[in-house]
């Protein structure tokens, strides 16, 4: 089999119909995912962006030199987007209550999907992303959207944007609305807004093909 898996369809018996082949691919990729994730220990890591030409550079990247960065951002908070990773990093945040077709998978259970979203952002868009799965349950064990809202608000000084992911309804809408009102960085809910964008794009293209206006 080609390591790129381009020939995956040819690995199944030729008498399989389309539905059988689809189920076979799903089973194959689930088994592969477990082995590959175990082998690599997840999909992402953090690597230094800046070089270290010599030992003395530690004095610039860390103390005492970095004090100028800290006070510079203190005096002008917008400098955080130029002097730190904030200008190119997104927090991918979930409480893991509605993960794909698996539902509530527990907070750490969502890490595979959040890592996957971070992986896509980096490979396809060149944007760094940090997967964060948090526990939004209150003392009674109920998922409280206010806990998630407060958590994300407190994270935003470290990130340039927030991508909300796999949060169950109706909490997802409440969380998105509250954070968009109160955060000073863009907040996006992939499952709601992403799906909406794709649906709208499909509708607009269909109207072009049909030669009709949206009002019709």
Question: What name fits each language-model region?
Answer:
Residues 212-216:
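Short helix-loop-beta connector
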Residues 2-185:
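N-terminal ligand-binding/catalytic initiation module
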Residues 1-2, 199:
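A composition-driven signal for long, intrinsically disordered, charge-rich low-complexity tracts
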Residues 188-205:
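A glycine-rich, Thr/Ser-enriched phosphate-binding loop motif common to dinucleotide/cofactor-binding enzymes
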Residues 77, 183, 203-210:
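Structural motif corresponding to the C-terminal cap of alpha-helices
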């Amino acid at each position: 089999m080609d390591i790129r898996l381009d020939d995956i369809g040819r690995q199944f018996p030729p008498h399989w119909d389309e539905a059988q082949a689809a189920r076979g691919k799903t089973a194959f990729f689930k088994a592969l995912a477990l082995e590959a994730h175990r082998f690599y220990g997840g999909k992402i890591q953090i690597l230094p962006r800046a070089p270290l030409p010599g030992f003395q550079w530690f004095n610039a990247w860390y103390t005492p030199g970095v004090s100028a960065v800290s006070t510079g951002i203190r005096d002008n908070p917008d400098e955080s987007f130029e002097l730190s990773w904030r200008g190119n990093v997104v927090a991918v945040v979930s409480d893991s209550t509605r993960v794909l077709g698996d539902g509530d998978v527990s907070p750490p259970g969502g890490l595979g999907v959040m890592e996957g979203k971070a992986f896509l952002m980096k490979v396809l868009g060149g944007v760094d992303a940090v997967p964060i799965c948090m526990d939004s349950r209150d003392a009674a064990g109920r998922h409280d959207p206010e806990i998630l809202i407060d958590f994300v608000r407190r994270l935003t000084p470290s990130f340039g944007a927030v991508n909300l992911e796999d949060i169950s309804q109706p909490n997802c809408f409440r969380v998105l609305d509250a954070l968009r009102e109160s955060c000073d960085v863009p907040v996006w809910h992939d499952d709601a807004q992403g799906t909406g964008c794709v649906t709208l794009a499909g509708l607009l293209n269909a109207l072009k093909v049909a030669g009709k206006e949206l009002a019709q």
